[in-house]
């Protein structure tokens, strides 16, 4: 489909996202699909009767496939729910160990020798467990600043749960009491139009109740007054800054149509995709395999996968390079033959009395074959 009306482009997404009402968004998508379906019916009408009948049978086969796929998704959802319940006791045990609520049996001898050390005696559980796990993931580490680390050491646990109405999932970040904000629970909910595709409707985060002067998503700039100014005080200015805690204030689409253009719509779409990527990474990678991210084992696993992909790419590139080199050699040979023949047919220079040879217009800037490598 090459026509503008046939493509579901950024402007279509923008017009859909402008409606905060979920039903309105779904209807906008349905209308678009109905329009496309109408265009497909036009295609069928242009087919010969025999071919049209064959396509109709193919559509019947597709319908049966879709019924099986629907059943698969239902059973998969039930299976995921079943195993999520089986995971939960393990997550509870992990929480107790990480936060020092329970002690593991069989402590190593060298740890017992350090019991007299005051610092070791004070440390319970696994300090900075979640901070380290998050920092070891490339997607999440890009969001964490040095200032954020002071607050993230108070992170006790991360959980997630499904949301049934509207469909989606919610992340829960449990914090110990800390000097940065009053909240002990920060949440981030993703509302989806379709979980299987997935199509994100919107994201909602907790408003953080910062203590005075402790906000990590803003920085205060002080500007010195001009020299000679009487009773002048430093000018203070507050600016937004990069922080992991911006995650709880997701990008919002303006209500007014006039407040957004196509360029801004594309920017918002990219921000929403990035935001969803962070949330899904925490849900699918960090929470289930937290200790592997803490130790760094998960990094090695991902690097191994990336290296395999790179090796395949390198092999393909080498093959392509060899082919290109062969083609270049053949082209060079052809060029040399052409240039030699041109030299024989036409003089490369024209002599004028009392002057140097001058290059003709049709050969100006050409080099003889032996100069190509210079």
Swiss-Prot record:
Main localization (coarse): nucleus
UniProt keyword Transmembrane helix, yes or no: no
Compositionally biased intervals (Acidic residues): 299-339
Domain of life: Eukaryota
Tissue: Ubiquitous.
Record keywords: Chaperone, Coiled coil, Cytoplasm, Lipoprotein, Methylation, Nucleus, Phosphoprotein, Prenylation
GO biological process, one term: somatic cell DNA recombination
Residue numbers bearing the Phosphoserine modification: 41
Ranges of compositional bias, category Basic residues: 343-355
UniProt xrefs under Pfam families: NAP
Motif Nuclear export signal, chain ranges: 47-62
Cited function: May modulate chromatin structure by regulation of nucleosome assembly/disassembly. May function in nucleotide excision repair (NER). Involved in somatic homologous recombination. Could be involved in response to abscisic acid (ABA) and to salt stress.
Subunit record text: Can form homomeric and heteromeric protein complexes with NAP1;1, NAP1;2 and NAP1;4. Binds histone H2A and associates with chromatin in vivo.
Protein name, entry field: Nucleosome assembly protein 1;3
Organism: Arabidopsis thaliana
